């Protein structure tokens, strides 16, 4: 089932963040959400994940979904290793070989046994990405997931994201044109207005 956003609006106090936004996220397809900083991309993500509710309008097709997500701020267990953080969300059927392939794909092979608190910001982002990709979900939402990664690692990571989300609904937020091109999205939602 497609996810349908129907004339939603959202304000925080006097600050209007989204106004009368409508869009569709097709089932099993990749959608890129683009827009400048502060235009409401993250607010839309919070509404899709049911972490907040719109002031007006409605969102259909989210109530029975299994979501996994990469947030702008990572939500990792500081004292656990990168591997343990990833295994927390994996099904028991995931193999060591699949995990090894994942570490290689996003260049984490040297640090997967280290506690997350010892990792750089870019490494932490990649741990968050693997958690979202390897969790049991049918819709993956990523809010600026490649922020802080160098260009070579970004390109390699996007290839792995596309491989692991094939057949799933992927909603990918970026403000960088290059990432939007690399993503080869089936659909693009541009949020143009900053209130």
Model-derived segments and their meaning:
Residues 115-123:
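Conserved ABC ATPase signature
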Residues 129:
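Hydrophobic anchor residue at the start of the ABC signature
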Residues 79-98:
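Q-loop/switch helix immediately C-terminal to the Walker
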Residues 49:
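Helix-to-loop junction immediately C-terminal to a conserved catalytic motif
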Residues 143, 150:
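ABC-family nucleotide-binding domains
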């Amino acid at each position: 089932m497609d996810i349908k956003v129907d004339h939603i609006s959202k304000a925080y106090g006097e600050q209007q963040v989204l106004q009368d936004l409508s869009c569709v996220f097709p089932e099993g397809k990749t959608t890129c959400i683009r827009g400048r900083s502060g235009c409401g991309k993250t607010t839309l993500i919070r509404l899709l994940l049911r972490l907040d509710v719109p002031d007006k309008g409605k969102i259909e097709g989210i109530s029975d979904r299994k979501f996994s997500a990469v947030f702008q701020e990572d939500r990792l267990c500081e004292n656990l290793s990168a591997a343990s953080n990833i295994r927390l969300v994996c099904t028991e059927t995931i193999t060591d070989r699949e995990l090894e392939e994942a570490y290689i794909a996003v260049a984490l092979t040297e640090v997967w046994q280290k506690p997350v608190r010892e990792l750089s910001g870019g490494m932490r982002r990649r741990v968050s990405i693997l958690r979202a990709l390897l969790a049991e979900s049918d819709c993956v939402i990523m809010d600026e997931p490649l922020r802080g990664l160098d260009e070579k690692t970004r390109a390699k990571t996007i290839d792995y994201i596309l491989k692991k989300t094939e057949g799933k609904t992927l909603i990918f937020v970026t403000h960088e044109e290059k990432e939007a091109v690399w993503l080869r999205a089936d659909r693009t939602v541009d949020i143009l207005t900053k209130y």
